[in-house]
A protein has these predicted regions:
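Juxtamembrane intracellular "pre-TM" segments in multi-pass secondary transporters
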Residues: 14-20, 207-241
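Hydrophobic core of transmembrane alpha-helices in multi-pass small-molecule transporters
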Residues: 31, 99, 113-134, 325-340
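Short amphipathic helix-loop junctions that connect adjacent transmembrane helices
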Residues: 42-56, 255-271
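Helix-to-loop junctions at the C-terminal end of transmembrane segments
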Residues: 73-84, 286-299, 384
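C-terminal ends and interior cores of transmembrane alpha-helices
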Residues: 94-115, 310-322
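Cytoplasmic helix-loop-helix junction between adjacent transmembrane helices
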Residues: 125-164
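A membrane-interface helix-boundary motif in multi-pass transporters
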Residues: 179-193, 382-402
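C-terminal transmembrane helical hairpin of 12-TM major facilitator-type secondary transporters
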Residues: 301-345
Length: 423
């Protein structure tokens, strides 16, 4: 790992211009990472099938990314508390570039002669990109470093907007560029190029936010459970549980929705992509702008609660979305709920830690989210397997998970309203 001193910033963070530059670069870091992830959504499974991957292996190929994020988010977050945010972000971008290049090499004529070797390369590359994608928590900690607590909801909303935009642009880029005369590897080269360019931009212009005197020591063992124990006196365990349940419920829905919309509603892949784009656009509008205006110090838990309730209702109503107008209304409500809940939970989490533990705190949040994204598709698939054709069962189970998140969020509310920052 590169030392923080070697990657020190060339200008201080005290100026507004420096902060605006940092906000933009972190936004681009998250956006490019999500575009790189989204590019793979429509093409990874058929790409892996070329090398003999079964449906279950393809599912693991998708899930292992989130699993690596789960294990390494707290680790990278804690390392960023020790050596600084900047070196972790830059090294992760370079690692992501290498991971995408490895995936592209699976199409190499020499390697592709051995399907098992190519498949092994794909798994190795997904492990690398998953580990490097765990730096999302460091990006959140970076923003928390330079943002006053009462303004963090708006900044976390900006990160949510990058998520939404990445999920809109990624699948579109992947679908369009994979079907060209350049071959199916082109999307992976594009993702690698975007990661490299962003790494260069960050190297040149991203300042460090954590001076040496404020850095903590790296603990020998970092884990989500350990972080929860150290912060058990705050509302962090309830925030962490809420985050896990919200993301898992949403992941159950997305995994089931693609199959349900295709088989039951007879939508094409293009139409399904447009529906997810519709969700993403609403997320951009809310998390990129509206959340800044409505989130105030002390009301974040109320917004998270309202968003979670909206998601419970929308998930429960989703099976009645055979009529397009109803479906659009339900999905709009779901996107609004998710866009209110996610950034406010991250804001609440950021207030639980000290300056020295922001990376570890946000790393635990990111890791819990990754675990939710790992389990969600498998739970959705398991429900569809034991109840064939009963897609509503998966949606209703997701609503149950979301209702559990509502209960968890209610445990946060009194602490925040009382005026504590969770400390």
């Amino acid at each position: 790992m590169v030392g923080g001193a070697e990657l020190s910033a060339s200008f201080p963070m005290s100026s507004d211009r420096s902060k605006h530059t940092a906000h933009l670069l972190i936004f681009l870091t998250v956006l490019i990472d999500l575009i790189g992830f989204g590019i793979l959504i429509p093409i990874l499974q058929p790409f892996a099938a070329k090398f003999g991957a079964s449906d279950m292996q393809a599912m693991w190929l998708m899930g292992i990314y989130s699993l690596m994020q789960f294990f390494f988010s707290p680790v990278l977050g804690r390392w960023s508390d020790r050596i600084g945010r900047r070196p972790v972000i830059i090294a992760s971008l370079v690692g992501s570039m290498l991971g995408y290049l490895i995936i592209a090499q699976a199409e190499n004529p020499v390697l592709s002669m051995n399907g098992k070797l190519s498949l092994l390369l794909l798994f190795a590359a997904r492990v690398v990109t998953g580990i490097c994608g765990a730096s999302f928590s460091t990006a959140q900690a970076y923003l928390a470093d330079i943002t006053a607590p009462e303004k963090r909801a708006g900044v976390m909303g900006m990160i949510g907007a990058a998520f939404g935009l990445g999920f809109v642009l990624g699948p579109v880029i992947g679908g369009l560029t994979s079907d060209t005369r350049f071959g199916p590897s082109l999307p992976f080269y594009i993702a690698a190029a975007m990661s490299l360019l962003n790494a260069l931009f960050c190297w040149k212009s991203l300042p460090e936010t954590l001076p040496p005197e404020k850095r903590g020591e790296v603990r020998a063992k970092v884990s989500i459970l350990g972080t929860m124990r150290r912060m058990g006196h705050t509302h962090f365990p309830a925030v962490l549980l809420s985050n896990f349940l919200v993301i898992m419920a949403f992941s159950v829905m997305t995994a089931t929705f693609v199959i349900w919309a295709g088989k039951e509603l007879h939508y094409s892949q293009r139409q399904i992509g447009l529906l997810f784009g519709f969700i993403g656009i609403i997320a951009i509008l809310i998390q990129g702008g509206l959340i800044r205006r409505i989130a105030k110090n002390g009301n974040e838990a109320k917004l998270a609660l309202g968003g979670a309730v909206a998601m419970v209702v929308s998930l429960a109503l989703l099976p009645w979305g055979a009529v397009l107008s109803v479906l659009l209304g339900v999905m709009a409500l779901m996107s609004v709920g998710n866009s209110l809940t996610t950034p406010t939970l991250n804001t609440l989490a950021s207030r639980c830690g000290t300056v020295q533990t922001q990376g570890e705190t946000m790393g635990a949040m990111s890791g819990a989210g990754s675990l939710g994204r790992f389990f969600g598709p498998f739970i959705g698939g398991w429900v569809m397997e034991i109840a064939p054709g009963r897609y509503e069962c998966a949606f209703w189970l997701a609503a149950v998970f979301m209702a559990a998140a509502v209960v968890a969020i209610l445990r946060i509310r009194p602490v925040v309203v009382a005026g504590a920052d969770g400390k």
